[in-house]
């Protein structure tokens, strides 16, 4: 993994961060059975180790070095996410962040230019703002920018114009990852969050 392109490690981190935020969001208010409750707790290990080790892990990968930081990031990216996916019910595996990805890839050429995990990380910002967590969104935007993950539609080569995003917004709110969430989310809510992400100062 230390010899692999850095961009794939980075994208893996973005997808892994999504696991933490989406699992906690989708499970909110539910009385979880043991397996799903355990998986949700393990999802913390998809987040906190990356806060500590992600930047150093990318630096190690850049220099083809298999050090402690890279090891911890890989454990989060592969082991922690795998355990969560196996333990929780499917309805707790994804939420807004992944649905944002599946909406945006409807745009011509978008998927070819943006890795899955990078877009999921952007989707985390959208999810946080939909949920009213502006300060957390600012904190996460700063973190993602430090990892060199694109944090706006403009950076990803897409327009934030409502008409351009018409099909995208429909897919986001009607996609299968949105079937089990704590409250109804509308196209207006998602679009407003996307606009805020563009302007958010992290």
Question: Predicted regions: what is each one?
Answer:
Residues 32-143:
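Active-site segments that bind and position negatively charged phosphate/pyrophosphate groups
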């Amino acid at each position: 993994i230390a010899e692999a392109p850095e961009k794939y490690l980075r994208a893996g981190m973005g997808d892994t961060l999504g696991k933490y935020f989406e699992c906690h969001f989708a499970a909110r208010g539910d009385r979880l059975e043991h397996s799903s409750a355990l998986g949700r707790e393990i999802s913390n290990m998809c987040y906190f180790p990356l806060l500590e080790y992600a930047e150093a892990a990318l630096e190690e990968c850049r220099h083809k070095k298999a050090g402690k930081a890279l090891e911890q990031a890989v454990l989060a990216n592969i082991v922690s996410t795998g355990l969560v996916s196996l333990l929780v019910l499917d309805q707790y595996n994804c939420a807004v962040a992944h649905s944002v990805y599946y909406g945006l890839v409807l745009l011509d050429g978008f998927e070819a230019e943006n890795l899955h995990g990078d877009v999921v990380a952007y989707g985390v910002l959208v999810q946080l703002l939909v949920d009213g967590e502006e300060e957390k969104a600012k904190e996460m935007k700063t973190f993602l920018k430090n990892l060199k993950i694109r944090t706006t539609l403009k950076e990803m080569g897409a327009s934030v114009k409502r008409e351009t995003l018409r099909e995208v917004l429909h897919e986001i709110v009607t996609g299968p990852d949105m079937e089990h969430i704590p409250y109804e989310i509308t196209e207006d809510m998602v679009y407003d969050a996307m606009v805020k992400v563009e302007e958010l100062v992290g």
